């Protein structure tokens, strides 16, 4: 949040670790794209709602519109080559089998502004249950986060380099 203080000024936001989740209202969507506007504190005052209510409503609407998805990155890459839809691992009941250190993509079904799913209650906890281990959350874009299980072999400098490379 510190590096984006100017942009976040006058906008309600929720801190998610080192990231800040702010709120947007979708005003139009068609085959050419989606248009949205950032919610401001003055809008909240006009509506007579608190930041807590805004967050609760936004999370419910986001989940209803586009559920949380966790994909194996290899399957996502294969989708672009072979047009095979990757399995959404987020809805599994049993832990994932992590033989090697895979990279997962955390997003939403629409793959639009999907990094925001990390602000939804219980999402990061569910990822921990599925992985059965600690993990790193690496920012990739506003549309997705990379999830990397911690097997103890990665150094902070390697993770930082990975984030720079992806971005």
Predicted feature locations:
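A contiguous, surface-oriented mixed alpha/beta subdomain in the mid-to-C-terminal portion of proteins
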Residues: 4-167
């Amino acid at each position: 949040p510190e590096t984006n203080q100017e942009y976040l000024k006058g906008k309600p936001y929720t801190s998610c670790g080192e990231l800040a989740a702010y709120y947007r209202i979708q005003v139009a969507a068609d085959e050419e794209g989606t248009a949205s506007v950032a919610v401001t504190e003055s809008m909240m005052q006009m509506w007579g709602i608190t930041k807590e209510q805004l967050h609760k409503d936004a999370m419910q609407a986001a989940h209803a519109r586009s559920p949380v998805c966790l994909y194996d990155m290899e399957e996502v890459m294969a989708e672009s080559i072979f047009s095979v839809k990757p399995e959404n691992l987020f809805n599994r009941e049993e832990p994932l089998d992590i033989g090697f250190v895979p990279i997962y993509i955390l997003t939403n079904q629409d793959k639009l502004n999907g990094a925001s799913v990390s602000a939804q209650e219980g999402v990061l906890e569910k990822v921990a249950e599925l992985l059965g281990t600690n993990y790193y959350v690496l920012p990739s874009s506003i549309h997705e986060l990379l999830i990397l299980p911690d097997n103890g072999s990665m150094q902070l400098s390697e993770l930082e380099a990975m984030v720079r490379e992806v971005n």
